[in-house]
Amino acid sequence: MKRIAKAKNKFNIFIEEVPIPKISPTEVLIKSKYTLVSRGSEIWRRYVRPEAIQQKMMGYCLTGEVVETGSLVDSFSIGDKVAAVAPHSEYVSVDTADKKLTPSIVKLPDKVDLIEGIFWPLSTSA
């Protein structure tokens, strides 16, 4: 699968090939449909400044479809349309029991399409 990564120094953004994540019992695997690049926190703070940022931290707004669920996950099912705090990547694993980000993933209502849902993480902060 492909994901966006950042090397050291300014403006070094690239697409790299990495394995599809394996999920734990409390995680779901999402096949990404859309990710949102934030002008402030990503373009300026992460891409323009010279310090390296952890690759898993590249991105935080994603929508897609659940394609696999861990054995302890009962709140999401395969095929669910979701928005998540997750990086720019073709596939991402999201921990449904993560208490640091509450919630880090939500089901999108039928009336909300995946493009609209991409703004969910931004709409939760003020």
Task: Set out the residue ranges of the language-model regions.
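NAD(P)H dinucleotide-binding glycine-rich loop of Rossmann-like/cofactor-binding domains
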Residues: 75-126
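Short, flexible, mixed-charge acidic loops at enzyme active sites
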Residues: 44-49, 96-100
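Short loop segments at secondary-structure junctions
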Residues: 9, 67-72, 95-98
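Extracellular beta-rich ligand/substrate-recognition surface
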Residues: 5-12
